[in-house]
Amino acid sequence: QVGSAEEINLPDRSIDVIAVAQALHWFDLDRALPEMARVLRSDGVVAAVWNQRDASIPWVAKLERLLGRQDSDFDPQGFIEADERLHLVGAQEFRHWQVLDRDQLAQFVNSRSEIVVLPPAARAERVNAVLALYDEYDRGGGLRMPWISRCFRVRLRLADAVEPATDVPDDDGTLLIDFK
């Protein structure tokens, strides 16, 4: 089913978790939060995740300069804590690596919003600069992109939240996400 955060095509009180990656700050929260509250069960949570590249690695620091800074000034926890409708229940940070070959790095760069909006010649110049960086640092087997995933468990606090449905759908046992 297709929907948006502002129009979730699910029954009232039908889900336990809403997972949002890299996007909560882009939603129209005045519309999205009541809609999330409508579909979440009374003990449901929003799982919000933001991924950031770890620029403490030299080649990644150079990549950051070539791409333009990522949302490094954006503080997801501060964003959550600043909104009285959001209650931070828990936070956890995870580090992981992604191995990228030359083509995958080019695809990654071409998918970045700050690159997509460039005129074609400027985009090609930027991609070529990143590929030169790849060639400088690759020792065979690809480059390891270090990521920091910041994960937050959030409960909604809305005064005008939808009252629990009296006809809560039966739990059919379907597990949509397995975090094990």
Per-segment meaning from a language model:
Residues 2:
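Conserved residues in the N-terminal Rossmann fold of short-chain dehydrogenase/reductase
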Residues 6-18:
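A short acidic, Gly/Pro-enriched loop at the edge of an enzyme's catalytic core
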Residues 11, 29-30, 57-58, 163-164:
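Short glycine-/acidic-enriched loop or helix-start segments at secondary-structure transitions
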Residues 16-30:
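A short SAM/SAH-binding and catalytic strip from SAM-dependent methyltransferases
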Residues 24, 52-54, 158:
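Short, flexible active-site-adjacent loop segments at beta-strand->alpha-helix junctions, enriched
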Residues 31-100:
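Conserved catalytic/acceptor-binding region of the Class I
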Residues 78-180:
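Conserved Class I S-adenosyl-L-methionine
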